[in-house]
């Protein structure tokens, strides 16, 4: 153990500071007397020289302090060679010192003093740099310095050559479909580059020269003359000659050739009489230039694209020649022969549908009504507020049936005895009749599913003729695809003369008729007979009101009442008055009728019960639609039975 003896003077010396020379002497003595690894006894006795050393250290100047710091460092190094218990004792004595006085030999102070010594920075860099650029990367910015460094040995990487060409950015035609996934044609997949657009200055210049001179530019046409082609020569007169056409060419190629001849004939008429030019058009190469992979056509396409922006639409729609008609096929000749800009608007106007006057839909006869009213829905939400018992086995009239989706749903699922769809637009009636085939396809799919489930049970009882039919049907079209996708072609429409199906079975119970339900005068109301049990009038009253005014709408309601049998039902869905304002400027007659309307939609119920003759009415519900404009209340009006008259 370490025996420690404290005297009064020793304790007083601890309050100050011991001399590092005395510490060094004591440590050396103890290390000599007691070797490392053995237990030592340290006796601290009174030393007369300790007070003198304390006074000396307190009165020393800055130079003496620095010397004591060096001595303290040496003493600390020697203490590390001593025993561990002795080192712990010294640390304890140092920790008892006052916080105001810091000895230069203190551990943290010693390390800080060592860190403040000046470090030697490198001066020789192998790559020729400096302290701020050791790798000499700045030399890559100067070509001369780079060449000098790489003259003997490639110490640094060579400077890459700068590409002075601007970066080409391809812009899709439709920013909402950058990958062109919605278009099935390959011609529309070409991306537009702003570097090759040419700008508007060149377009105006060509337009200016084309308007003044009227000359035909034939540069860049590398078409050779061959058999089966059309030659156009301008010698003061225009001559168009057409020779043998290949028998193997299709009808589309012949129409393509005709449009080429017409466009070349037009261009020859605009040329001057003093200027003689020869142009030859090869029929075989004319079809090949439509392919974007052909190098000559690609050069012409770039040149045409730089000349006018309208060329993009013409070149992209070139792949739709069969669907766009004969006018769009002339785009091939325009690409081969870049005519002046005065002919381009004529070509573009023929293909741009927005240039044509839009149909106003004066009577609300929208051709995509169910598409935007019920987007992504298989059934009309108005069906949920109706009761199937109202229609089962009854005679039904649907006023304003449009394309007949609601009419066909009622006819197929609720099995009325007969249902008639009436609309003023003949094209909508034609579409409704074609939609019967769609519903028949669904019926066949259901039958095929049922038959597929029962084929295994009834396989032994099938006759020979039915087996042959099954074999032919299996070879012609897979049963699984018929179940999942329906037949390839819809079934034919049933003939009206035949009565093979019993009444009430679809599609024998549905009929579509074109007609105007609003009579010309009130006198014709006297001739109306009772024919129907249920009459539907869904979202029609606004169009009757705008086109025929209050008088026409009142006549419309009176005819509905007379058309119903006793106890009949009238299902009405009127549009609100706020929706009238959006369509008041369609025609002059509509605008005039709009300002003369006095019978508002909120007054229909009182008018139908007091003046028309309906006994009662009830609100059966409001259709739940995504659009608030189509969330309209539906009312049911009752006609008195015959016994109560």
Swiss-Prot record:
Belongs to the methyltransferase superfamily. GO terms for cellular component: nucleus; ribonucleoprotein complex. It catalyses: a 5'-end triphospho-guanosine-ribonucleotide-snRNA + S-adenosyl-L-methionine = a 5'-end methyltriphosphate-guanosine-ribonucleotide-snRNA + S-adenosyl-L-homocysteine. Residues 380-642 form the Bin3-type SAM domain. S-adenosyl-L-methionine-dependent methyltransferase that adds a methylphosphate cap at the 5'-end of 7SK snRNA (7SK RNA), leading to stabilize it. Also has a non-enzymatic function as part of the 7SK RNP complex: the 7SK RNP complex sequesters the positive transcription elongation factor b (P-TEFb) in a large inactive 7SK RNP complex preventing RNA polymerase II phosphorylation and subsequent transcriptional elongation. The 7SK RNP complex also promotes snRNA gene transcription by RNA polymerase II via interaction with the little elongation complex (LEC). Residues 199-210 have a biased composition (Basic residues). Disruption phenotype: Transcription elongation and RNA splicing defects, as well as aberrant anterior (brain) morphologies. This is 7SK snRNA methylphosphate capping enzyme. Residues 15-45, 56-68, 75-89, 263-273, 282-292, 325-348 have a biased composition (Polar residues). CDD domains: AdoMet_MTases. It comes from Danio rerio (Zebrafish). S-adenosyl-L-methionine binds at residues 370, 382, 400-402, 423-424, 516-517, 538.
